[in-house]
Amino acid sequence: MISVATAECFTHGKIGTKIHKIACGYKEFEKDSNYDMIHGNVYVMASMFLPSKKGIESLLDVNLPKPDYVFKYSKAYNQENDILVAKLVAKALKNKLNCNIAISSTAGIGNGAVCIVTDYNDYVFSSDIYGDLLKGQNIIKRQESGIEKAYNTFIDILKKEYNLK
C-alpha cells in the first residue's frame, strides 16, 4: 500500500480528503475514473489543514521563513516564497511521517504553490489562477485550480512511479 500525507493551506485539506475518501471506498467517488487505481492501493496517513506558521513549525519540526505579509493568524507569502515554503513543508512532512508521498500547499499573493515529494522525485507547481489572500481576490477559484492540478499530478505519479493502472 502506498502511504500519503498532506499538509495543506490554500487547499484546506481537500486534496487529502478526496484521496482518503476514494481510498476508503466512499460511494460518492465510485464514478471517479481513478477509483479502482486508488481504492485498495493507497491510504492516507494524515490530511491536515495548516494555515499558520506556528502550527506547521510545531507539528513538522521545520523552520519557515518570516511571512512576507501580515494576515490575521495565517502566513502569507509572495509567489517565490510560496514555492520555497511548499517544498519545505512537503519534505518535512515526508521525513516526519515516513510516508511514500507527501503533498503540501500554500498561497498568499500569487498563484500559490503545491509540492509533492515522493520516494523518487519532487514536483512543484502552481495553480492556474492568480489570487490575493489579503484582498480575498480569486481565492476560491485559485483553490479549485490547485486541488485539481494536485489531484491530477498525484494520479500521474501513481501511474509513472508506482506502476498503478
UniProtKB/Swiss-Prot annotation:
Pfam families: HcgF
Domain of life of the source: Archaea
UniProt-listed InterPro entries: HcgF
Family, similarity comment: Belongs to the UPF0254 family.
NCBIfam families hit by this protein: PRK00962.1
Protein name: UPF0254 protein MMP0935
Native source species: Methanococcus maripaludis (strain DSM 14266 / JCM 13030 / NBRC 101832 / S2 / LL)
